[in-house]
C-alpha cells in the first residue's frame, strides 16, 4: 500500500500547518502584550521622573530623551550644590569645635558660649537640610522644639532631626522634605529662619 494514500497520515499532516500558525499567533500575541505592559511601565516611570524635576529642566521639552537629559543636568547641579554647601557646613563645624580658635585657657568656655547662634540651609537628596548651632543653655539658647516650631510655621515637613553637643553648644541637623526646589529660595529661607528664631528668643 502506498504511504501517501494513508488517510490517517494525510489528515495528521494537514493539521500541522494550522497548529504552527496558531503557535505563531500565540507568540505574537504574548510578545505584543509584554511590549504593551513594558510601554505602560515606562510611561509611569517617566511621569514620576517629570514630577520630581524642577520646571526649568523640562520646560518646553516633550521628548523622553530630553527629560532624561534634564534629569542628568538636575542631578549634576544638585551634586554641585550639595558639595559646595557641605564644605561650608564642615567649615562651620570646624570653627565651632576647634579649640585653637578659643582665646585663653580660662576664658575658652566663655568665648565659645558667647558666639552667636547660626542657621545654615542646604539641599540634600530628599529636600534640604537645616543645620542650627545654638548655645546649650541660657536666655539665648534655641531649644530644638523652638526650631521645629519655626519650621512648621513656614509650612515645612520635618522628616528627621539629630542633636549633637559640641563645646557647650547644641547643633541640630534637621531634614526637611520638599517636592521641588523651585518652591524655595534657600537663601531667603535661611534668613527667614534666623529672623524668626531671634524674634522668638526676644519674646521669651
UniProtKB/Swiss-Prot annotation:
Cysteine pairings via disulfide bonds: none
Give the span(s) annotated as Disordered.
Answer: 1-27, 93-116
Which CDD domains does the record match to this protein?
A: bHLH_AtORG2_like
Q: What sequence ranges are listed for the domain bHLH? A: 26-78
Q: Which UniProt keywords apply?
A: DNA-binding, Nucleus, Transcription, Transcription regulation
Query: Where located?
Result: Nucleus
| Keyword Nucleus found | yes
Q: Which InterPro entries match?
A: bHLH_dom, HLH_DNA-bd_sf, MASH1/Ascl1a-like
Q: Name one GO molecular function term.
A: protein dimerization activity
- Please give an example of a GO cellular component term from this record: nucleus
Q: What is its main location?
A: nucleus
| UniProt GO BP | regulation of DNA-templated transcription; regulation of transcription by RNA polymerase II
- Any one Pfam family here would be HLH
Q: Share what the entry says about its subunit structure, partners included.
A: Homodimer.
Write down what this protein is called. Answer: Transcription factor bHLH120
- The gene for this chain is BHLH120
